[in-house]
Amino acid sequence: MHTVFYVSDGTAITAEVFGHAVLSQFPLAFEQITIPFVETLEKARQVRMRIDEQFRQTGVRPILFHTIVDHQVREEVLKAQASSHDFLNTFVSPLEHELGVKAEPRLHRTHGMENRKLYDDRIEAVNFALANDDGITTKEYDEADIILIGVSRCGKTPTSLYLALQFGIRAANYPFIEQDMGVLDLPAALKANRHKLFGLTIAPQRLHEIRNQRRANSRYSSLEQCEQELACVERLFRQEAIRFLDTSSHSVEEISAKILEATGLRRQLY
């Protein structure tokens, strides 16, 4: 098995994201090790020695994905016996030529706090998502960028939090529960903000599996109950012309991207 090292003088998030995207194209398993904040020559030497030791023990050359700004630190890490892939310089040099401007490398620029307003906006969005989770309150819906609606356990909460943390979007979510299913209608707070509504649904069998993990062998988790609730809620979506998405086979990242594409919501953070 190949060992993959993600090394950076910052958080290593960028190296991980790019690396995961590349490795996902291969039907192989990898041992993955992340080493952030390699900011000194001494730390770089330790990383080089660790990579070389891994090679010595396994006999398989490790793969190294790195985003290191400092030239000396980067060169020390690159002495390691590894297949090295530099995401920053791969793109920086061609862009310098295209833009006619020299890059000005700086530590922690990507995921640091250089832009305090963007950071504050993201924290406020996360706080908003938590305060408006699961229909706790509907008083702040006028401040929401989007309101996700659907049955319990269809993916509303993780999607709301991801939209907030990743994009600074104020996402509220509201659940339809069993007691709502008799004559299902939009509550007044949702009607007043119907232009912000976006529905989530899910395959009955998948919902049954998820609910069974939380409350096994209950009416709440029974396949029949899941089928009835979903049929009722999807009927409401169609009657009210509310856009909705089946989350059954999508990750939270994919769900969020599809919502942004469908709604045209502007990504606040990059």
Swiss-Prot record:
Q: Which reaction does it catalyse?
A: [pyruvate, water dikinase] + ADP = [pyruvate, water dikinase]-phosphate + AMP + H(+); [pyruvate, water dikinase]-phosphate + phosphate + H(+) = [pyruvate, water dikinase] + diphosphate
Please tell me which top-level EC class this enzyme sits in: transferase
Its Enzyme Commission number(s) read 2.7.11.33, 2.7.4.28
Q: Which domain of life is it from?
A: Bacteria
Q: Which InterPro entries match?
A: Kinase-pyrophosphorylase, PSRP
Give one Pfam hit by family name. Answer: Kinase-PPPase
Residues that, per the record, bind ADP? G150, V151, S152, R153, C154, G155, K156, T157
The UniProt record lists the keyword Hydrolase = no
Keywords assigned by UniProt, alphabetized: Kinase, Nucleotide-binding, Serine/threonine-protein kinase, Transferase
Q: Which GO terms describe its molecular function?
A: ADP binding; ATP binding; phosphotransferase activity, phosphate group as acceptor; protein serine/threonine kinase activity
Q: Does the keyword NAD apply?
A: no
What the record says about family reads: Belongs to the pyruvate, phosphate/water dikinase regulatory protein family. PSRP subfamily.
Q: Which HAMAP family match?
A: PSRP (MF_01062)
Q: Which NCBIfam families match?
A: PRK05339.1 (NF003742)
The protein's role, per its UniProt record: Bifunctional serine/threonine kinase and phosphorylase involved in the regulation of the phosphoenolpyruvate synthase (PEPS) by catalyzing its phosphorylation/dephosphorylation.
Q: What is this protein called?
A: Putative phosphoenolpyruvate synthase regulatory protein
The organism's lineage? Answer: Bacteria, Pseudomonadati, Pseudomonadota, Gammaproteobacteria, Aeromonadales
